[in-house]
């Protein structure tokens, strides 16, 4: 029998028509991205610290976490976005590590954290780095606030070099009645614009996204040169309109140098790790959906059509088809370059393993336009 069946046994003798239904070629689902909110615990809250719960709106947050940072963050996040699933966990005595341990293996694509002390930043960076690695692949991007003078923000930027952490630089922000916003409220509005945009299209730039309900009351805004320096130090920036409304300018990651200490812009914008996560998940979903129980044969093997067998060239063809599809969606570019560099081969030491090396080129955002006008008379 050439066709590989999963349910109909080869030794069946009872008369009948037995037809399997296989959905392995039909998966086109997009992953539902989730947000985790982390804030300080308050006395008397219904939900104990280090307990993750679904928390979809401000009222739910107040019932579960009282008048806390978490409630404030839900309020301002929901001013920006109404649909992203939100979970929350509270931290007791600044012990963020214990709260992170409570997450288990559940993936949260975006993490909104009001705590920004050195220990939290370090613990969160280590946690995110581990979840980004190949053996876990449950990554996320964290958004943290920092309010201060320009000099204080520049100094703070050196606290982390994690490509999965994005700091928001805060000057003086308020609500529509000019009531000062807390850092938690400000960064929630920031993440409320950034996270849903990345979920919808990880490559699309984020400048000019308006933070609803947020206004500047600063007597002096950071000028171009100050914001440019902040961006070089791993601190994200915003701009202020003539009506004092606040817009996202450029959310960058904290990653500014490589292991050798040399300046490195490979993870400059948050779109880059977001796109890398998206691309990897697409590849994993493809292989697991189509070839979850296939046999593996070397190139040139002659096998009957319908057999659940895969070869390196079949895998390569599927990866190329996926890349072409993602190119059409505006996620990647240079298909011919990708095709030339893609290597798919059997492992020399483990014949049940296939290895591949590819070099995708992600589509970038249009962030800077430079021109030179040479006029004539």
Language model segments and positions:
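Surface-exposed assembly/interface segments
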Residues: 1-377
């Amino acid at each position: 029998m050439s066709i590989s069946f999963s349910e109909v046994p080869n030794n069946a003798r009872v008369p009948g028509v037995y037809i399997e239904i296989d959905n392995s070629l039909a998966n086109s689902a997009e992953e539902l991205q989730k947000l985790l909110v982390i804030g300080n615990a308050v006395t008397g809250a219904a939900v104990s610290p280090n307990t993750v719960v679904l928390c979809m709106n401000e009222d739910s947050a107040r019932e579960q976490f009282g008048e806390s940072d978490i409630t404030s963050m839900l309020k301002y996040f929901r001013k920006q976005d109404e649909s992203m699933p939100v979970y929350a966990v509270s931290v007791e005595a600044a012990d963020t590590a214990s709260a992170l341990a409570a997450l288990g293996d559940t993936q949260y694509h975006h993490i909104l954290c009001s705590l920004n002390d050195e220990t939290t930043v370090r613990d969160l960076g280590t946690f995110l780095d581990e979840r980004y690695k190949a053996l876990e692949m449950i990554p996320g991007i964290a958004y943290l606030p920092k309010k201060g003078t320009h000099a204080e923000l520049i100094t703070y930027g050196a606290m982390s070099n994690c490509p999965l952490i994005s700091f928001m630089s805060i000057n003086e922000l308020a609500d529509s009645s000019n009531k000062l916003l807390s850092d938690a409220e400000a960064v929630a509005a920031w993440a409320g614009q950034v996270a849903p945009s990345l979920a919808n299209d990880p490559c699309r730039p984020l400048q000019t996204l308006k933070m609803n309900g947020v206004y500047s009351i600063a007597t002096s805004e950071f000028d171009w040169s100050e914001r440019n320096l902040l961006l070089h130090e791993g601190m994200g920036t915003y701009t202020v309109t003539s009506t004092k409304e606040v817009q996202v300018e450029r959310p960058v990651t904290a990653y500014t140098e490589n292991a050798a200490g040399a300046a490195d812009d490979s993870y400059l914008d948050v779109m880059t790790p977001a796109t890398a996560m998206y691309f990897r998940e697409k590849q994993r979903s493809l292989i697991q959906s189509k070839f979850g129980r296939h046999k593996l044969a070397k190139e040139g093997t002659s096998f009957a059509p319908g057999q659940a067998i895969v070869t390196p060239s079949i895998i390569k063809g599927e990866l190329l088809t996926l890349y072409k599809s993602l190119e059409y969606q505006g996620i990647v570019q240079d298909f011919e370059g990708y095709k030339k560099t893609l290597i798919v081969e059997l492992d020399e030491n483990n014949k049940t393993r296939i290895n591949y090396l590819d070099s995708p080129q992600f589509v970038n955002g249009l962030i800077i336009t430079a021109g030179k006008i040479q006029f004539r008379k």
